[in-house]
Each structure stands twice: as structure tokens, then as C-alpha cells.
């Protein structure tokens, strides 16, 4: 199935095939989700079959909305598809932009809607092995140190989020 994502071409938002957007480094829409619980953040290790950054640790969920799909709807859909997570309310935090080389001649140039949710105790993710090979609850207080200690094991965008946008993402993140 060919997936078309909202991409800016010559200043106009248009549906462009996802791989083409990455090969050309075109600016496109994306979402990122951070699920928290009791001071921890849920990280996922990307499946080895992913076409870029396989086997690297990332935030809870990140993807691209399909053409004409709202960011929050996309976030909820992918939480379910990747991690079997349903019915966790998400709060929009902000929209940020970054550009990163993700290897293999691919560039992520994303305008990202960031969402944060709180997973209740007793609820656990159920990994889709085509998308996720491992999950881990990591203390928010030590996440940046862990990424700094082993930078090659984390996605470029997680580095960027922690370096440039952590205050936006995590400030009052657990408030109702």
C-alpha cells in the first residue's frame, strides 16, 4: 500500500508518497507521542524491518499523518497499531520543526505535532513486532543522561527533542 503524507512542495501542502518525501528531504507533517507513568517515559525500540533507523530507541510513538488525517487522530491510530494502546487521553503540547539525516540517503524534515499522555497503572503496551521490537519504561530524570551515554542507540529525533524541546514536551506533562 502506498502511503501519501502531507508535504510542502513549492510552498503548497500536497499529498506525496512517504518514501519520496524522505528521499527528497521535503518538509512534511508528523506526530510524536510521549506516554508517561509515575515519572517514567515509555520508549520503543524500532523493529529491524523499519526502512530507516531500525533497532534504535525512540519516543513512545512517531509517524506521519495520512493525507487529510488530523494529528491527534493519527497519534491515537498509531499508538493502537504499534503498541496496542487505546483510550489514553492525549494532550497536544506544541508543534516543532526539525531536519535530520536518518541514514540511507533519507532525510526527515518534519513539522511535528507533539502529544503527551499518561498511561494508567495496570495498563501495558502490546507490541506489534512489525513495528516495535522492545519497549521500556525509563525514568524521565535520567533519560537525557542515558541518551548522552549511548547516542548511537537512539534515533536522531529523540536527540533533537531532548536537546531543544524537552521543556515544551515535559513541562507539567503529568498535570491533568
UniProtKB/Swiss-Prot annotation:
Main location class: cytoplasm
EC number: 5.3.3.2
Annotated localization: Cytoplasm
Any one Gene Ontology molecular-function term assigned to this protein's record: metal ion binding
Pathway: Isoprenoid biosynthesis; dimethylallyl diphosphate biosynthesis; dimethylallyl diphosphate from isopentenyl diphosphate: step 1/1; Porphyrin-containing compound metabolism; chlorophyll biosynthesis
Role description: Catalyzes the 1,3-allylic rearrangement of the homoallylic substrate isopentenyl (IPP) to its highly electrophilic allylic isomer, dimethylallyl diphosphate (DMAPP).
Protein name per the record: Isopentenyl-diphosphate Delta-isomerase
Gene: idi
